[in-house]
Design a protein with these regions (language model features):
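Glycine-rich, flexible loop/turn motifs
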Residues: 87-91, 107, 123, 131, ...
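A generic structural signal for well-ordered coil/turn residues at beta-strand boundaries
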Residues: 19, 40, 99, 121-123, ...
Length: 446
């Protein structure tokens, strides 16, 4: 039986008349070309006499009568008068359950075809889409077990929440992401590795994520050597894949490492197009694109995307422009402390500097009270830490300090967790209850 609809669709996509343009200049990252009737976001093919395969490029702007293109590949063989052919399409990504367990590049093409064969997905999803309508978003009211005691007990997350992981380099961000991917109660994980070192990609997949974690995960990878537009697209491709699963009613966890490198890629694109540098050297488009990307995750009327975005904090400066902007957009932030990491305390989460803005909604009142008592122990001990270590504090002076000294080892032991250990949510609540001597009854809503 002939699938007539399939052929009708192909006819609709066909372009009977081919429109061509020519390259005029290549300056840095930008290709200037004369191409008629194109639009922002349209994909073009740049042909070279020295290469059989064309280079994909995207229309990113216009200057006078010229079209500004940014390549999605290497411009090595492109020269003056190279042909530019518009495709009439924007970038899309293939979606479907066949994506699970696969590793894709920044434009959604499979990187693991040697091991797993070609990608047999027939449905396509637009890389760019609008966030869910504010009135159609479901409220964040159901807790999501992350399987990490420090988060489940003191920074409880909800389905559809967006959380930032803020840390300097080398304090365990990738390890924490691997734990979240393995332990979280989600149907699908989508992980975007943006601007990572090439060596770290396989390390993350095999060591941090593991075979079990990969089975329900889609990995999108755009390493630091890729063109800036590819690194930029990697974030959008991963978000589009997560949206496609959300539209099927799935509970999705999206993780991106890192938003900082996404912002740097957007800065490169903006500067190449002539934007002026502003706050912190970033172009205005960076601060326009961040909310467009981050607002796409969350709940819809069909499913949920719970998102974790890592942010590189240079010199532990939480007020640098990207960190400050991301923190203002998201629903919570988890700070990883270099001091805790230096003490061998992993995960190096600092509960006193971190916050979940939905915890009071998704956690019960008894759970919240117990969490407050644990925080009080940590805060009291930290405030008197120097006096205690010097032996200058005399027991009996302050009951709160005495209580903190008696319980600090138990609290810190509770917050530590092995990388391969998964913490049960109810057991975590029971243990935090015993730490504080409180009673947690029906702490979990749902």
């Amino acid at each position: 039986m002939i699938e007539i609809d399939k052929y009708l669709l192909e006819l609709d996509r066909a372009t009977p008349v081919q429109v061509k343009g020519r390259v005029k200049e290549v300056i840095g990252l930008v290709v200037k070309a004369a191409v008629p009737d194109v639009w922002i976001g349209e994909l073009c093919l740049v042909y070279s006499s020295r290469s059989k395969l064309p280079v994909k490029a995207e229309v990113v702007g216009f200057q006078g009568g010229d079209v500004l293109l940014m390549p999605l590949g290497d411009l090595q063989n492109v020269g003056p008068q190279s042909d530019v052919v518009p495709t009439g399409k924007c970038l899309t990504v293939k979606v479907g359950p066949q994506l699970l367990g696969r590793v894709l590049n920044g434009v959604g093409e499979p990187m693991d075809t040697r091991l797993r064969g070609p990608l047999e997905c027939h449905d396509e999803y637009p890389v760019y889409s609008h966030p869910p309508d504010p009135l159609s978003r479901q409220r964040v009211i159901h807790p999501l077990s992350i399987g990490i005691r420090a988060i489940d007990s003191l920074l409880t997350c909800g389905e559809g929440q967006r959380v930032g992981l803020f840390a300097a380099a080398g304090v365990g961000k990738s390890t924490l992401m691997g734990m979240i991917a393995r332990n979280t109660e989600a149907d699908v994980n989508v992980i975007a590795l943006i601007g990572e070192r090439g060596r770290e990609v396989l390390d993350f997949i095999e060591q941090d994520l593991g075979e079990e974690g990969l089975k329900r995960t889609v990995v999108v990878c755009a390493t630091s050597n890729e063109p800036s537009l590819v690194r930029l697209k990697g974030a959008y491709v991963a978000t589009a894949i997560a949206e496609s699963f959300r539209d099927q009613g799935k509970k999705v966890v999206l993780m991106m490492d890192s938003v900082t490198r996404f912002a740097r890629a957007q800065r490169e694109v903006g500067l190449a197009c002539g934007e002026p540098p502003t706050r912190g050297g970033y172009t205005p488009s960076v601060f326009a694109e961040l909310p467009k990307l981050l607002e796409r995750s969350g709940n819809s009327d069909k499913g949920s995307i719970t998102a974790f975005y890592t942010v590189l904090v240079a010199g532990d400066d939480m007020n640098e422009p990207v960190a400050d902007e991301v923190r203002s957009i998201l629903d919570g932030h988890i700070i990883l402390s270099r001091d805790l990491a230096a003490q061998g305390h992993y995960p190096a989460i600092d509960p006193l500097q971190s916050v979940s803005r939905v915890m009071t909604t998704v956690a019960g009142p008894d759970h919240c009270r117990a969490a407050e008592q644990v925080r009080e122990v940590l805060a009291t001990y930290e405030k008197q830490r120097d006096l205690i270590l010097l032996g200058a504090y005399q027991r009996g002076t302050d009951r709160k300090v005495d209580f903190a000294i008696d319980n600090i080892d138990a609290v810190q032991g509770f917050l530590k967790q092995g990388t391969q250990e998964k913490a049960d949510f109810r057991e975590t609540l029971s243990r935090v209850n015993k730490l504080c001597g409180a009673s947690i009854i029906n702490a979990r809503k749902g």
